[in-house]
Amino acid sequence: MAGNSILLAAVSILSACQQSYFALQVGKARLKYKVTPPAVTGSPEFERVFRAQQNCVEFYPIFIITLWMAGWYFNQVFATCLGLVYIYGRHLYFWGYSEAAKKRITGFRLSLGILALLTLLGALGIANSFLDEYLDLNIAKKLRRQF
């Protein structure tokens, strides 16, 4: 487990800023397309921006949890790099979806793939820590010795 989590914290703050920016874009779209709260329907242009932001919000807890677990229990630098790619994928997704529903696919697939990888790395790291802590078996150390 990493003693210093500064890289994970930096990616977390950056991703929080991205979420805030997406929310701001929904506010701007509400003004532009004259959709007043609490309404969430209106022009297709507004609905795409709103839906893109909502999807990002829906996936955000999964991202934060898997980012930190992969960083703490697997490798902070690798998890940080994956986190930055995830943020880029969400950027592609949001702006693609804002233009046309079909343009969201690339960003969605990229960010979903990164989430799957972060989940896998976190699970592997947690499993290794569990085995080391409770069974005195460190798979990662044994693998490092082999290579």
Curated annotation (Swiss-Prot):
Main location: endoplasmic reticulum
DNA repair among keywords: no
Gene Ontology BP terms: glutathione biosynthetic process; leukotriene biosynthetic process; lipid metabolic process; membrane lipid catabolic process; positive regulation of inflammatory response; response to lipopolysaccharide
Its EC number(s): 2.5.1.18, 1.11.1.-, 4.4.1.20
Keywords, comma-separated and alphabetical: Endoplasmic reticulum, Leukotriene biosynthesis, Lipid metabolism, Lyase, Membrane, Microsome, Oxidoreductase, Transferase, Transmembrane, Transmembrane helix
Catalytic activity reported: RX + glutathione = an S-substituted glutathione + a halide anion + H(+); 1-chloro-2,4-dinitrobenzene + glutathione = 2,4-dinitrophenyl-S-glutathione + chloride + H(+); leukotriene C4 = leukotriene A4 + glutathione; (5S)-hydroperoxy-(6E,8Z,11Z,14Z)-eicosatetraenoate + 2 glutathione = (5S)-hydroxy-(6E,8Z,11Z,14Z)-eicosatetraenoate + glutathione disulfide + H2O
Expressed in which tissues: Liver, spleen, skeletal muscle, heart, adrenals, pancreas, prostate, testis, fetal liver, and fetal spleen. Very low expression in lung, brain, placenta and bone marrow. Abundantly expressed in human umbilical vein endothelial cells (at protein level).
Induction annotation: Upon ER stress with brefeldin A or with tunicamycin, MGST2 is down-regulated, in several non-haematopoietic cell types, during the early, protective phase of the unfolded protein response (UPR), and up-regulated at the late, death-promoting phase of the unfolded protein response (UPR).
UniProt superkingdom: Eukaryota
Subcellular location(s) per record: Endoplasmic reticulum membrane; Microsome membrane
TM region positions: 6-26, 59-79, 111-131
Matches recorded under Gene3D superfamilies: Membrane associated eicosanoid/glutathione metabolism-like domain (1.20.120.550)
GO cellular component annotations of the record: endoplasmic reticulum; endoplasmic reticulum membrane; intracellular membrane-bounded organelle; membrane; nuclear envelope; plasma membrane
Membrane topology: Multi-pass membrane protein
The keyword Hydrolase is assigned to this record: no
Activity: how regulated: Each monomer can bind on GSH molecule but only one subunit is catalytically active.
Role of this protein: Catalyzes several different glutathione-dependent reactions. Catalyzes the glutathione-dependent reduction of lipid hydroperoxides, such as 5-HPETE. Has glutathione transferase activity, toward xenobiotic electrophiles, such as 1-chloro-2, 4-dinitrobenzene (CDNB). Also catalyzes the conjugation of leukotriene A4 with reduced glutathione to form leukotriene C4 (LTC4). Involved in oxidative DNA damage induced by ER stress and anticancer agents by activating LTC4 biosynthetic machinery in nonimmune cells.
Subunit annotation: Homotrimer.
Family: Belongs to the MAPEG family.
Protein name (database record): Microsomal glutathione S-transferase 2
Naturally occurring in which organism (per UniProt): Homo sapiens
The encoding gene: MGST2
